[in-house]
C-alpha cells in the first residue's frame, strides 16, 4: 500500500506542476490581451513635474518599462522569459505597487498577516462546525435540528462584502454597539499598556475579520459533517456496535465520526484557497495590510510581475490543499486502495 501511495503521490505532483503551469500561462495571456497599457497604469501617481520635462522622458521611461516587462515581445516569448526567471528563483520586480522592489520580498512581508488570519479562521471553522454537525446528526429532523439547518443556510447565503460592511456599521465606531475596532489588525500601543491589555486589544481587532472569513466555511462544513454522519450512522456496523452495548458517545465519536471524516477531508481541500480569496475582500474592508490588500493594489495598477507571483502562490496553495487532502485520506482510512488510481 505504501508503494502504491508513493506512486500515486508522485503522479499527483507531476499533474499538479502541469496544472500550475497551465494556470500561469493562461493568467499571463489574459493580462497581456486585456485592453490598455500596463506601463501607463504603472506610471500613474508619479510626479507630473514641469511640463517642460516631459513628453520625451515619459516616453523613454515607458519604453524602458515595456522592455523590462517583456511587453515589447510576443506573448509566448514574454511568458517564457518570465518563467525562466521563476525557475531561477526570480519572480521579478514590482512595476507599480512598490517600484523596483522584488515581488517575493513584498509577498513575504504581507504573508504573515494573511496567514495569521486564515489559520485562526480554519481553527474556528473546524472547532465549531464539526461538533455542531455531529450534534445535529444525532438529533435528525427534530425542531432543534431544523433550527440549526435554517441558521446554517442563512449564514451560508450571506455575501462576505455585505456582511463585513454591516458588521462595521453595527459593531464598530459610530455603530449601535461600538465594541470592536473599525480597521487594522494591531492596536495602537500606548505607553504604560500591559502585555495583557495589548493582547486583549489585538484579539478584538481579529474578531470581525476572522468571523467574516470563517462563517461561510463553518456553515458548509457543519452541513457536510451532518450529512456524512447521517450516512454512516445507519450502517450495519453501527447497529452492531450499539447491540454490543457500547455507549452512544463511543458509537458516534469512535465509529461513526472516523468513517465520516472522508467527507470533511474532501471539503478541506477547497477551504485553503477559498479563504485566501475571501481575504481580498475582508482585508480591503478592514484595511488590513496583508496579501488581500496587496492583490487589490496589484490588480488596480496592473502590476504584472506582482500579479503573476500572486497567481503562482494562489495556484500552488490550491494544489497543496488537494495534495494534503490525499495524505489525510490515508491517515483517516488506511484501507483506501491507491493502486487502482495510478
Model-derived segments and their meaning:
Residues 2-7, 111-116, 120-144, 160, ...:
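Alpha-helical transmembrane segments of integral membrane proteins
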Residues 5, 68-130:
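An internal, D/E-rich "acidic patch" concept
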Residues 10-16:
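N-terminal signal-anchor/signal peptide hydrophobic helix marking the start
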Residues 16, 110, 114, 150-153, ...:
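Residue-level signal for discrete positions within transmembrane alpha-helices
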Residues 20-77, 171, 176-198:
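Hydrophobic alpha-helical transmembrane segments of membrane transport/permease proteins
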Residues 21-26, 75, 119-123, 166-167, ...:
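Hydrophobic alpha-helical transmembrane segments of multi-pass integral membrane proteins
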Residues 23, 27-31, 36, 168-173, ...:
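Juxtamembrane/transmembrane-helix interface segments of polytopic membrane transporters
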Residues 27-33, 151-184, 212-218:
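Membrane-water interface segments at the C-terminal ends of transmembrane alpha-helices
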